[in-house]
Each structure stands twice: as C-alpha cells, then as structure tokens.
C-alpha cells in the first residue's frame, strides 16, 4: 500500500512548514511565548550563522508525529536571542573586534605601492604579548630603624628628683661611646681659652703599670699632642715696615737668574762675615728687604723656609734634585742657590 495514503488530509502550508519542502514565509504577529526587545542589528540572522534551535519543541511534537520521522523544522526566531550574548546559557563571540579597532578592508582601496601595503600587513600580524607580573610581598628586617635624634644639645631628660644637672652648660656633655682623655681635653680647652700658661697647674697623663693596652694608649697620646700642635694657630707678627708676601717670594725666578745660579755657588756659613752681615746677605739674595733691625727680615726668611719645607711639591722637587746632585757630584737647578741658603 502506498505510504502516502496513510496521511490524512491536512493543510498544505502546515506540511510544507514542518517538512521544509516549501519556501519560507515571514508571518506577521506570530504568536510566541516570550517577548525580548532586540536592536535592529540583532533582528535578523546573518547568512553565516547556523540555524538556532526552536524555543519550544513541544509545538512541533504536538502535531501528528507518530507515522514517521519529520524533517527538521525551520523557524524564524530572532537570532540575536539564541546566538547572542543575551540568550540564556549563550556564549558571546570572543573573536569579534572591539569598536574602533583596525580593519584591513577599509584600506584596500588606497592607491599606494606594494611596500606600503606590506607595511599595512604587519598591523594584522602583530599580536601583543601579555606579560603577567607576579606581585610578591616578602617580610624583611630593616637595617636601620629611624629614630628622632637630639633636637638641641641643651634639651635633656630631667632627673628623677627634678633638680637641674646643667649638662652641657656647666658639665661637658660628651657621647658615652668614646670618652676623651681628661689631660688631652684640658690642653684643648686651654688652647681655645688662651689662658696664661702659669694660671693652672699642668696636667700630666698617667698610665697604670698593669695596663694591657699601655703601648696603644701611648701612641694615642702622641697622636693627640701632635694634633694639638697642628691646630695651634701661627703667631701673628705686625711688621713695622712693609714686607713682601710669602706667595710672591715663592714664585719662580727668571731664567737668566736660574742660569746664573747654576754656574756659581752661594756663600756658605764659612764666609768671613759676622752673623748680622751674613743675615743681611741671605735676605738680599732672596729679595727680602732689610732695614735697620734685621729681626723682622729674618722672621720673613724663616717663614719662607717653613713654607718651602711643608709644601709637598717643592719637597718632592728638592728630593729629586738632591738625588741628581749626589749622582752628578754638582748642584744646580731651579732655585738651587736659594735651596742651599735655606738649607733644603
């Protein structure tokens, strides 16, 4: 028997709709179970989107499906609801470009060379690298702990009995880590106060015989006394006559004078002259003026001698000249005669 005779007469439109043999037709005011507001871009599905499943499968199963399997139904449901991000359980398309992103289709019509087109191709090839930085917080012990220091040396913690201790005013305030030697401290204060030497009895440093660090303390004592003598200001002398500056006397002599000094020797102390005349002669050779009293001129001479002696440049120069003199057996050089006179 022909299978087509088993089907009862039914509306051809319904059969075409469910069998999928007739063309699709949009039905206005189609009844539906749920209403969703969609935008114009989401109203109709695109050609590349797959057909979505029907919203309610019971509508299809309500027809006579007992005689045989029916063809898959074609529905006209809005694709924005099923395939979009607003559908229940739907997954949004992660490949969609964000708004304002670079689109290669917009720049295909440009009239540019192949090299420029190749540059545009690098834009699409670029893939940014995502670098995740791990934030690690590690406990640590700081090397230095900030603390508020002494604002003023005269601001001290008061005594428990509320009596003034005058620390820093009447009693010398020193750090407790390294105490000063009382004898050295007294000499320093005496030097600063410029008291008369005989005003107070001299303090003498003492060391215990059983002290283990006796040698070290002796070296510290010698170094402290040397520092006191170095810090002592030079004596101030007011000359009655005008004297040249020490820096001017230390200047290099003219070349002709140096040439002359190389060919002759300065008078030594064996010359038959009294001390006053010999002092005048030496001061005259060094461009130091000599007046009736040669004491001030000799003071300038000895000051010049100390400047040459303490100057490291001249000291090194004179040591080299002395070595050369010892090797050659003669004397000469810059300020050679002056050095002989000054004893350098």
From Swiss-Prot:
Biased composition annotated in UniProt, kind: Acidic residues: 1-16
UniProt entry tagged with the keyword Protease: no
Keywords annotated in UniProt: Cell projection, Cilium, Cytoplasm, Cytoskeleton
Disrupted-gene phenotype: Individuals have short, non-motile flagellae.
Region (Disordered): 1-100
Biological processes annotated in GO: axoneme assembly; cilium assembly; cilium organization; cilium-dependent cell motility; intraciliary transport; outer dynein arm assembly; protein stabilization; protein transport
GO cellular component, as recorded: ciliary base; ciliary membrane; cytoplasm; cytoskeleton; intraciliary transport particle B; motile cilium
Biased composition (Polar residues): 18-30
Protein location: Cytoplasm, Cytoskeleton, Cilium basal body; Cell projection, Cilium
Pfam families: IFT46_B_C
Subunit organization: Component of the IFT complex B, the core composed of IFT25, IFT27, IFT46, IFT52, IFT74, IFT81 and IFT88 as well as associated subunits IFT20, IFT57, IFT80 and IFT172. Interacts with IFT25, IFT52, IFT70, IFT88 and DAW1.
Functional description taken from the UniProt entry: Forms part of a complex involved in intraflagellar transport (IFT), the bi-directional movement of particles required for the assembly, maintenance and functioning of primary cilia. Plays a role in maintaining IFT complex B stability.
Family the UniProt entry places it in: Belongs to the IFT46 family.
PANTHER family linked to this entry: INTRAFLAGELLAR TRANSPORT PROTEIN 46 HOMOLOG (PTHR13376:SF0)
Protein name per the record: Intraflagellar transport protein 46
Gene name tied to this protein: IFT46
């Amino acid at each position: 028997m022909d299978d087509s005779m088993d089907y009862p007469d039914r509306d051809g439109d319904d059969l075409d709709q469910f069998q999928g043999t007739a063309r699709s037709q949009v039905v206005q005011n189609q009844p539906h179970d749920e209403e969703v507001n969609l935008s114009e871009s989401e109203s109709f599905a695109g050609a590349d989107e797959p057909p979505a499943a029907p919203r309610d499968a019971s509508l299809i199963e309500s027809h006579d499906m007992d005689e045989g399997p029916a063809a898959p139904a074609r529905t006209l449901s809005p694709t924005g609801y099923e395939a979009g991000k607003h559908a229940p359980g739907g997954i949004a398309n992660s490949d969609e470009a964000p708004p304002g992103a670079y689109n290669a289709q917009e720049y295909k019509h440009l009239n540019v060379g192949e090299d420029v087109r190749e540059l545009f191709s690098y834009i699409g090839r670029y893939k940014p690298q995502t670098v995740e930085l791990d934030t690690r917080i590690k406990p640590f012990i700081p090397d230095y702990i900030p603390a508020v220091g002494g604002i003023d040396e005269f601001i001290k913690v008061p005594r428990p009995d509320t009596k003034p201790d005058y620390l820093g005013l009447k009693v010398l305030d020193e750090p407790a880590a390294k105490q000063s030697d009382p004898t050295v401290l007294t000499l320093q204060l005496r030097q600063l106060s410029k008291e008369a030497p005989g005003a107070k009895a001299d303090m003498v440093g003492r060391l215990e015989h059983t002290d283990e660090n006796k040698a070290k303390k002796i070296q510290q004592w010698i170094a402290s006394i040397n520092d006191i003598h170095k810090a002592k200001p030079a004596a101030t002398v007011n000359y009655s006559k005008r004297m040249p500056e020490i820096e001017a006397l230390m200047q290099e002599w003219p070349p002709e004078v140096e040439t002359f000094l190389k060919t002759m020797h300065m008078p030594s102390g064996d010359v038959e002259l009294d001390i006053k005349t010999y002092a005048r002669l030496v001061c005259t050779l060094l461009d130091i003026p000599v007046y009736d009293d040669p004491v001030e001129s000799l003071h300038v001479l000895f000051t010049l001698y100390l400047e040459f002696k303490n100057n490291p440049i001249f000291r090194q120069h004179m040591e080299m000249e002395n070595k050369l003199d010892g090797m050659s057996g003669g004397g000469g050089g810059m300020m050679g005669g002056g050095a002989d006179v000054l004893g350098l």
